[in-house]
A protein has these predicted regions:
Chain B
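Terminal, compositionally biased segments used for targeting/anchoring and flexible tails
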Residues: 2-216
Length: 118, 216, 89
């Protein structure tokens, strides 16, 4: 059975692969926040799970190999939100610089709203 | 609730009062930087508030394979409920009080002669709203590639060796449905109540890569 | 008589939910699922028209020939009707 040309990388059914490694990991807080953001923003109609998948697919196989699940998800959610006009890249870039300046760790940079001054 | 991966647990995680995990103290990654900034912008613009995000995390944390296990146990003991699961597994889940949202659930039953197994070859679709998060291996290349072509070989890697007179049915979640396997009720369980039966039902048995456990 | 169908062979380069390992294969409709928004439109911020969705059952021998572990094992997938052609016996 020869492979039809045009199979996209994510379309994995029937491809050769190694053994299943029964690994699992506990979810980090930031990962849960990514997941929750996806659920809430898609429920608000800003994008669909189909759009999320489309961007993940278009990201290509290298991204699948080098980035974790939630790293790819935050990239995809961002692209969908940019396409939806939820915020601009300039706004995001500016805020990312501010966040980065709050400290060194995730905990320091993700300070609760009451503690933040901008 | 037994766990298939002995090193950790998703269940019993309390969203409040949980101690900071190691990742809270790790250097901020680019992606974490994005996540914080995006969440703040969306909150300030009223698109997705912190409260909504936190409520959704609480909802996610409250879901676990234990919910699916309770559904399986009731399926085993209650013939009328069994018919309702067969007719509409989503409605039957809601009847048990599970907040499954828009989940469109189909329950596929294992018997003496049929063994079902679930996959999403195209991404990682999973009945999250009933069972919680899928395991990492479910989302990875090896499982997604091989289980639709050589399911028996994959099941053997999980320690499940099926005889030739058992038919294997693989279900690829390609669209809007989500699937739960109802594992076969183990022998020697006639005297167990629903709670004790639910304790035998593992996450992996509801994906189809394991059987339910036998009573101790 | 359960409807026998063949999955379309086309390979368009974009977001579709018909796995390539099923394209051109013959199966039988296991059940009708109703109508759902077309993911091929929803993925691109387009209004998604409702399309008929079916669960289609394939034998492993149909999919993999001699490579099938057990020819009578089956594979079920949800396929939108616009990907299915009638394949009378």
């Amino acid at each position: 059975m020869s492979e039809p040309p045009g199979r996209r990388w994510h379309d994995m059914g029937g491809q050769s692969a190694g053994s299943v490694v029964p690994q699992d990991h506990d979810f980090a807080l930031w990962e849960k926040r990514v997941d929750a953001l996806m659920v809430v923003a898609s429920a608000k109609g800003l994008f669909t799970v189909d759009g999320l998948r489309r961007v993940l697919e278009d990201m290509g196989e290298a991204a699948f190999e080098t980035h974790s699940y939630y790293e790819r998800w935050i990239l995809s959610i961002n692209q969908n939100l940019i396409e939806a006009g939820a915020y601009t890249l300039a706004e995001l870039g500016t805020r990312m610089t501010v966040v980065r300046g709050r400290g060194e760790t995730y905990g320091e940079c993700a300070r609760p709203a009451g503690d933040r001054d901008g | 609730m037994p766990h298939d991966a002995p090193e950790h647990s998703h269940t019993g995680i309390s969203p409040s009062g949980h101690p900071y995990r190691a990742d809270q103290d790790a250097p901020l990654s680019y992606f974490q930087n994005m996540e914080i900034a995006m969440r703040e912008l969306l909150s300030e613009k009223g698109i997705a508030t912190e409260a909504e995000i936190n409520a959704e995390i609480d909802r996610m944390d409250s879901r676990s394979p234990a919910d699916g296990a309770r559904l399986v146990a009731r399926f085993w003991v209650d013939p009328a409920f069994r018919e309702r699961v067969r007719a509409d597994a989503s409605a039957a889940s809601r009847e048990m009080g599970f907040d499954i949202g828009a989940l469109r659930l189909i329950a596929v039953e294992n018997t003496e002669n049929v063994h079902n197994v679930i996959v999403c070859t195209l991404c990682s679709c999973y009945p999250r709203n009933l069972l919680g998060f899928p395991p990492d291996w479910y989302k990875q290349r090896a499982y997604r590639s091989r289980v639709v072509k050589t399911p028996r070989s994959v099941l053997r890697e999980f320690g499940l060796d099926l005889p030739g007179d058992v038919q294997v049915r693989v279900h690829d979640s390609t669209a809007d449905m989500r699937y739960i396997v109802i594992p076969a009720r183990p022998t020697g369980t006639a005297d167990l109540n629903e709670t004790a039966l639910a304790a035998l039902v593992t996450r992996d048995s509801m994906i189809g890569v394991a059987r339910a456990q036998s009573p101790a | 008589m359960v409807e026998r169908v063949r999955v379309a062979r086309m390979m368009p380069p974009g977001h579709v939910r018909t796995p390539s390992y099923l394209r051109g294969r013959i199966g039988r409709i296991e059940r009708d699922l109703g109508h759902f928004g077309n993911p091929e439109q929803a993925a691109y911020h387009l209004e998604a028209s409702k399309k008929r969705l079916c669960r289609v059952r394939f034998s492993m021998s149909e999919l993999w020939g001699d490579a099938a572990e057990n020819p009578s094992d089956t594979l079920d997938a949800e396929i939108f009707a616009h990907w299915l052609e009638s394949a009378p016996d």
